[in-house]
Design a protein with these regions (language model features):
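C-terminal and inter-domain tail/linker signature
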Residues: 1-139
Length: 139
C-alpha cells in the first residue's frame, strides 16, 4: 500500500500542481476528503478546486519538486520545494512580478486510492515577504 500511495502523491504534485490538471483533483479527492492547513479546511473536490484556481492564478508557473517522501500504512509524508513567479492576483494581492521560492511539508492519508485527508504546512510568511505584502521589521 505504501508504494501505491507514494505514486499517488507523485501524481498529485505532477498533475495538479505542476501541470494544473483539475481532472486529477476529481479523480483523487472524494466528497469525504478534507484538506487542512490552507486557511479554512477544504472539504471535497469543489472546495479544493476553488483554492487551486486562486493559487494558480497568482502563481501560474508554479513548479513543485518532491525533496523527500516516506510512507507507512495509509499515510505519506512529503517534504517539497517550490518556485514560481507572482504574476496574478488570485490570492487577493496585486501581482508583483517577483520570483519566489518556498518549501513545505504535507501528510496525506489514503483509502482505496483516494486522498481522504491531507495536512499542509509551508512558509506562508516567507512567501508573503517575497511578494512584498509583508515587510520584515527594521532591526
Amino acid at each position: 500500500m505504501s508504494t501505491e500511495n507514494k505514486a499517488l502523491v507523485r501524481r498529485w504534485f505532477k498533475e495538479v500542481w505542476n501541470e494544473g490538471n483539475t481532472k486529477t483533483i476529481d479523480e483523487l479527492l472524494t466528497d469525504r476528503s478534507v484538506i487542512h492547513g490552507l486557511g479554512e479546511d477544504l472539504r471535497g473536490p469543489a472546495a479544493f478546486k476553488s483554492f487551486h484556481a486562486a493559487y494558480r492564478d497568482a502563481f501560474p508557473d508554479v513548479k513543485i519538486q518532491i525533496d523527500r517522501m516516506v510512507a507507512e500504512d495509509d499515510l505519506v509524508a512529503v517534504h517539497w520545494s517550490a518556485s514560481a513567479t507572482h504574476s496574478g492576483s488570485g490570492l487577493g494581492f496585486a501581482a508583483s512580478g517577483r520570483p519566489v521560492k518556498f518549501s513545505g511539508m504535507g501528510i496525506a492519508r489514503f483509502e482505496a486510492n483516494k486522498l481522504i485527508e491531507g495536512w499542509n504546512n509551508f512558509d506562508q510568511l516567507g512567501l508573503l515577504q517575497q511578494i512584498g505584502v509583508v515587510a520584515l521589521p527594521a532591526s
